A protein has these predicted regions:
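Juxtamembrane and boundary regions of transmembrane helices in multi-pass small-molecule transporters
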Residues: 2, 178-181, 189-241, 385, ...
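Hydrophobic mid-bilayer segments of alpha-helices in multi-pass membrane transport proteins
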Residues: 22-34, 44-65, 87-93, 124, ...
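Interfacial loop-to-helix junctions that mark the boundaries of transmembrane helices
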Residues: 16-20, 39-51, 77-81, 113-118, ...
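Core transmembrane alpha-helical segments of multi-pass membrane transporters/permeases
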Residues: 44-47, 51, 71-107, 120, ...
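Membrane-interfacial loop-to-helix junctions in multi-pass transporters
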Residues: 81-86, 111-128, 156-165, 245-253, ...
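Hydrophobic alpha-helical transmembrane segments of multi-pass integral membrane proteins
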Residues: 90-93, 119-150, 334, 347-350, ...
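Intrinsically disordered, low-complexity non-transmembrane regions of multi-pass membrane transporters
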Residues: 1-26, 70, 228-243, 295-310, ...
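Alpha-helical transmembrane segments of multi-pass membrane proteins
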Residues: 120-133, 159-175, 363-376, 400-428, ...
Length: 486
């Protein structure tokens, strides 16, 4: 996304087309009702409820705000353009995962990982390793789509539930991404708030360290509880199946080395991932003995290996490029909805209403975090959650003599990690797709007055601790930097 993008503020909207707070809440209520009834009650995939939400928001724009079809079209187009890189990365990651499975890269990581790790240390090690990789390459998505997929397999072999493993991967990946000078969101947060990049990173370090440390502690406790759950001989059975199906020499890690090497060198995400696809295809041919056409059919159609062990077969089934359709269409619909809500002025009105509730520096910083989360939920992409409050609240920080690094820290502490908690958000749809684990599931038993919650969200500790650290710092004033002292 272009960091020069500036979303509408209230002053940008002509008075005759400016939504009232009631009109702004109408589309928001529609989203909540349609997703709640459609996905929560009827059990539909999110596609139809998102489409209903888009149509309803469009009707509000046409009927109540007297916008034209061209206005609505432009708003939806802007939402899709903002998320275009995310959509292209989605296509590419699905192809990359398939070629890396066929190349033996992901099976190789599983093979060696199962020989080293134990259930007791697996989850904290996963979180820390994901943090190091994401910090090094500047991408939570790439970390999850490569290292993360392999660790889901390792965790399954060790008897660790996949939602726990997914939560640990995400905690580390987003913590590392958040602090990396190579990360797109880190650079974006600094750019839209007019903050020096390294001042922004420095302002986040205490909150990130605290949130990641608490997350690792949670995973250490979960790991102790998971210990001893492996059926006798399961690890060796899995390793034997992997070694019997794939060549597991260290050379199978060539695609991984090439991809991470390019990322460390600063090559943009898309060409890096495309190169990883080519490296995976050629490793499949050279090391696994596949025909040229077979390797490139995997790129399109995915893998369905027969290893002789059902658990391993299930872990290594991939959809390839064609398997990305479900995920990409959800993300495209969510981006369209987010662009429409921004374009008709709904998000600008909500941001302005937030400012009316600010009475101190402490409430401003806490309110910024809340604004980032609300924007994440209704725009369905983390870029908007950083850009909208980052641009809209700059003057408020000046008026309260707060340096811009306070603003950049607040929008990223909440905006970057929390998207993957929201089931229809682009980040959550992506992570759920690559891990094969739902973001959030739930059921209510009215007869017994009980409820259950599943998916990876309850185990994604960093997404809870990062905002919590920000709110504690906001309440105490810790880490505030006055503009006059900067």
């Amino acid at each position: 996304m272009d960091s020069d993008f500036e979303p509408k503020t209230l002053s940008d909207i002509p008075p005759e087309r400016r939504p009232s707070i009631g009109e702004a809440l109408l589309p928001i209520l529609g989203v909540v009702v349609f997703l709640g009834v459609g996905s929560g009650y009827l059990g539909l995939a999110p596609h139809a409820p998102l489409l209903w939400s888009i149509v309803f928001a469009g009707l509000v724009g046409l009927v109540r705000l007297e916008l034209t079809y061209a206005d609505l079209y432009d708003a939806v187009s802007n939402g899709l353009i903002m998320g275009l890189q995310a959509l292209l990365i989605l296509f590419t990651i699905y192809a990359l995962i398939a070629t890396w499975v066929s190349a033996g890269t992901i099976p190789g990581l599983m093979y060696y990982g199962l020989g080293i790790l134990t259930p007791e240390i697996f989850l904290p090690i996963t979180a820390l390793l994901a943090a190091v990789v994401a910090f090094s390459i500047g991408s939570s998505w790439t970390t999850a789509g490569t290292l993360g997929v392999a660790f889901i397999g390792i965790g399954s072999g060790l008897g660790i539930p996949a939602p726990m493993t997914a939560g640990a991967i995400l905690s580390g990946a987003y913590a590392g991404d958040k602090q990396s000078p190579l990360s797109d969101t880190t650079n974006l947060a600094a750019a839209v708030t007019n903050t020096d990049l390294y001042d922004h990173i420095d302002a986040m370090k205490v909150g990130t360290a605290l949130a990641l440390g608490l997350s690792v502690l949670v995973y250490a406790v979960l790991g102790l509880r998971a210990g001893g759950a492996i059926p006798a001989g399961q690890v060796e059975s899995i390793r034997g199946a992997l070694a019997g199906t794939y060549a597991t020499t260290p050379f199978v890690f060539l695609p991984l080395v090439v991809t991470f090497g390019l990322a460390l060198y600063g090559v943009p995400a898309l060409p890096t991932l495309v190169t990883g696809v080519f490296a995976g295809a050629f490793t499949t041919i050279l090391l696994q003995g596949a025909q040229f056409t077979t390797a490139w059919n995997v790129f399109l159609n995915g893998t369905s290996p027969e290893t002789g062990v059902e658990l391993v077969n299930g872990l290594l089934v991939t959809g390839g490029l064609s398997g990305s359709a479900w995920t990409v269409t959800v993300v495209a619909l969510a981006l369209s909805l987010g662009g429409l809500l921004e374009g008709i002025g709904v998000l600008a009105v909500l941001a302005d209403e937030l400012l009316d509730l600010v009475w101190s520096e402490n409430s401003l910083v806490a309110g910024t975090g809340i604004a980032a989360f609300v924007t994440n939920a209704f725009s369905a992409q983390q870029y908007m959650s950083i850009v909208l409050p980052g641009v809209s609240l700059r003057n408020a920080y000046d008026e309260h003599d707060l340096d811009s690094r306070n603003l950049s820290r607040a929008v990223e502490a909440v905006g970057t990690p929390t998207g993957a908690l929201i089931p229809w958000h682009a980040g959550a749809v992506y992570m759920s797709g690559v891990f094969g684990v739902p973001t959030l599931t739930g059921s209510i038993d009215l007869a017994n007055l009980s409820a259950s919650i599943g998916g990876y969200a309850p185990y994604y500790a960093f997404a809870f601790f990062s905002p919590l650290a920000l709110f504690v710092m906001a309440a105490t004033g810790y880490g505030f930097v006055a503009k006059s002292d900067a």
